Amino acid sequence: MNKKITLVLFVLLQIYALQTLASDVFKGREVFMRECMACHGEAGEGKLPGLPNFKEGQTLFKTDSALIDIVRDGKGVMPSFNGLLTDEDIRNVVAYLRSFL
């Protein structure tokens, strides 16, 4: 009986976690399309010279923390989004970027 209850709870927690992750990716896509697409392209291909192609380069092999720092603080020609995006928005954008892998 305890094994059945444990299994049911495990399955329910997994479903909840997947729904939360999907929501974060969806919200991240909305922010990306609004704030990032002009330079990085709709599919993350990098529309301007020197910008990373998220589907081919090493950028997405960085840690979430490193990517969050880049979005928050800026890097090279990329401006800082500190104060323009919430911490949650930035985490959601990183979750969306991970969907390119």
Question: What residue ranges belong to the model's regions?
Answer:
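Gly/Gly-Pro-rich "capping" loops immediately C-terminal to redox-active cysteine motifs
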Residues: 25, 29, 41, 45-70
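Post-cleavage N-terminal segment of exported redox proteins
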Residues: 1-24, 70, 97-101
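Short pre-active-site segment immediately N-terminal to redox-active cysteine/selenocysteine motifs
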Residues: 24, 32-38, 43, 74-77, ...
